[in-house]
């Protein structure tokens, strides 16, 4: 039953479906380094626990151009695994290219997408499967994401919880202790390291938009943001499953102000792209989006005020982050204006 196949694919090249899996766990990896082994090992444990609920489970690891030779680590961790598994090599850089390759190469009607730097609670997959069986009408799923291992103590300017936490970077997802359905909207939804779908969602609404998401040389995020915006506009909701827990680390290289500013600048760019994907058009003067200027002015005034009123380092840096977001929005809109059309539309099919 165990498989160690290694397949190559571009993001839009369909792979033959292998076996008759009912559930597909798809892990996206690019240079996972020391995090990959624990991610695969703890995911294996979670899958093995779930086999008593559903024995037809497959595990795909989609490698998106790693240079750290992950195959040896994967083979070591999955040797003798009592379920189908394989590695898919997605050749086109970008997390959404990798996700789409995983969708095309998997067979399950129930799909869970995860990252290769998280660690899994042993009951992670069991919680999802039980919730899915008890809520057959649910089509989108979110698990709980907690802050995992810190490679260094968090600096004073970095809030890990509360209203100042940047949960798109210090990744977290928590909507309480009850399994419940929640509307998809701008402030509520699953997060990329721990989310699930019934396959018919992609059949009906299309795959992930490859104009969005982190890729080599780009810190513009929002890989799943466009998908959830698309689904929200069609009235879909998501089922939050609190027992489906993963732990997301915070790496030393990420705990710098420069990294956060770049990521938040990317958040602003992603917001601009999302609004364009909706067909929204901005009023500009010399490339400057007029509707954004009040938000940028307010954010800048708040940043200055946070210094003048001797607010905490975390409060001051949160205000700095808001400025970075709106500057990113203006940057993306200016690029679009200068090009005369979205520079990203050349790389992707139209959004459904």
Residue ranges of model-derived segments:
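Conserved donor NDP-sugar-binding/catalytic core segment of glycosyltransferases
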Residues: 123-160
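Glycine-rich, basic loop-to-helix element that forms the pyrophosphate-binding segment
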Residues: 90-106
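Short aromatic/hydrophobic "clamp" motif used to bind/position activated sugar donors
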Residues: 111
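Non-catalytic, C-terminal membrane-associated alpha-helical segments of glycosyltransferases
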Residues: 262-269, 276-352
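A conserved acidic beta->alpha catalytic loop
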Residues: 42, 63-72, 118
């Amino acid at each position: 039953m165990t498989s160690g196949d290694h397949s190559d694919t571009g993001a839009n090249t369909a792979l033959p479906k292998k076996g008759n899996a009912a559930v597909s766990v798809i892990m996206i990896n690019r240079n996972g380094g020391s995090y990959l082994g624990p991610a695969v090992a703890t995911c294996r444990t979670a899958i093995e626990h779930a086999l008593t609920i559903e024995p037809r489970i497959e595990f795909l690891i989609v490698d998106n151009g790693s240079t750290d030779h992950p195959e040896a680590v994967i083979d070591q961790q999955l040797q003798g695994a009592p379920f189908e598994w394989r590695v898919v090599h997605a050749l086109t850089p970008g997390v959404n290219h990798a996700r789409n390759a995983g969708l095309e190469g998997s067979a399950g009607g129930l799909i869970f997408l995860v990252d290769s730097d998280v660690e899994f609670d042993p009951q992670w997959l069991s919680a999802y499967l039980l919730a899915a069986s008890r809520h057959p009408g649910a089509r989108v799923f979110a698990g709980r994401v907690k802050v995992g291992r810190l490679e260094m103590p968090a600096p004073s300017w970095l809030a890990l919880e509360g209203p100042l936490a940047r949960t798109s970077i210090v990744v977290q997802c928590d909507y309480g202790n009850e399994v419940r359905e929640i509307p998809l909207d701008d402030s509520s939804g699953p997060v990329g390291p721990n989310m699930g779908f019934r396959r018919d969602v992609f059949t009906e609404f299309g795959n992930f938009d490859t104009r969005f998401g982190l890729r080599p040389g780009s810190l513009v995020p929002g890989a799943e943001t466009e998908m959830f915006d698309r689904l929200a506009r069609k009235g879909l909701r998501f089922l939050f499953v609190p027992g489906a827990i993963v732990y997301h680390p915070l790496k030393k290289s990420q705990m710098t102000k420069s990294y956060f500013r770049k990521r938040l600048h990317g958040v602003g760019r992603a917001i601009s792209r999302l609004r364009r994907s909706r067909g929204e058009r901005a009023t500009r003067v010399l490339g400057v989006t007029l509707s954004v200027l009040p938000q940028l002015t307010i954010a800048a005034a708040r940043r200055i005020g946070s210094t003048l009123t001797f607010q905490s380092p975390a409060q001051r840096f949160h205000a700095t982050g808001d400025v970075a977001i709106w500057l990113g929005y203006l940057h993306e809109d200016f690029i679009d204006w200068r090009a005369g059309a979205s520079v990203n539309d050349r790389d992707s099919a139209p959004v459904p």
